[in-house]
Every structure is written in C-alpha cells, then in structure tokens.
C-alpha cells in the first residue's frame, strides 16, 4: 500500500507536468510566419528576433478590436519605439477574418471603421494573409495581443494603457 501511494503521487506529478507543459507551449510557443500586408509588402517574423514585436490579432467587424485600435496606444508606442523612433519595437495588425479585404479595412459596409487611416504600422489581412498568420497562434477570440520577444516566445498579453503596456515590452526576455 505504501508503494502504491508513492507511485500514485509520482504519476500525478508527471501528469501535472505534462499538462502544464502543453499549456505553456500553447500560450508561449514561438511563431514563425511570412505574410504580405495590404500594400503587398512582405514581412517575415524571423527578421524581428532582435526586438520586441506586438502582433494584434483582430477582426474588421469587432467592436472591442476597434476600441483598442482607435485608443492610440499602439500608434504611440510605434511612433516612439518603432522603426522611426528608437527601433526597439515593431507592431503588426492582423485581421484574422478570412473575409478581410482592402475595402473592409478602409471602412466599407461590414466593417466597424476605417482601419487604414492614421495607422503607421503594417496591416495584414486581405487575400487570406491575415487568417494565415492568425492560424499560427492559439487564441480564444478577438482582439488578442501577442508579444514576441527576442527569443521568439510570444505570450498573450492584456490590452492596457501606454506605459503599463510598455512595461510588458521592457520585461520581454531578449
């Protein structure tokens, strides 16, 4: 009986370790993708391993996505720390809906607004590009943000105000 109890404890510990490993892999695994933005410029995630990179997976019809997008946090961070700032940060907007199109991103009927005007960072979505990128991530709904660190690890992070959000970037393991 004594050994059966010890074996049971060991099996429980192994099972728990395996479950936690699967959760960690789903939440924080490295994603590698190449996609064209709506201007047909190609982006390869492997070119951004030297900086923190935010991937915002949203949908053109999503109200909470629109509220986050128009809140200005990503634009401010991109301006201050992106390619035209300190160049230590990159942002990608991904319209994960397979029906995404240039006209929908420009605010056509069926979209909650014009995603293009005032957006300085790449918008990936039309022609299935956004859905293809989104398929590399495990997420439960829109909007979802992933922060790639220099190591390629991309944990899901919360939407927040600029400096709290920047703290996540600073804590990003490089």
Predicted feature residues:
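Bacterial N-terminal signal peptides
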Residues: 11-23, 27
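N-terminal "domain-start" segment that seeds a small globular fold
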Residues: 23-48, 67, 122
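Conserved helix-turn-beta segment immediately C-terminal to the redox Cys motif
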Residues: 50-53, 69-95
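Short pre-active-site segment immediately N-terminal to redox-active cysteine/selenocysteine motifs
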Residues: 51-53, 57-61, 98, 141
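Conserved redox-active cysteine motifs that mediate thiol-disulfide chemistry
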Residues: 57-75, 100
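Thiol-based oxidoreductase modules, predominantly thioredoxin-like and allied folds used
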Residues: 84-104, 116-130
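Short, internal strand/loop/helix patches
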Residues: 107-142, 146-147
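Non-catalytic, surface beta->alpha helical segment in thiol-disulfide oxidoreductase systems
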Residues: 140-141, 147-174
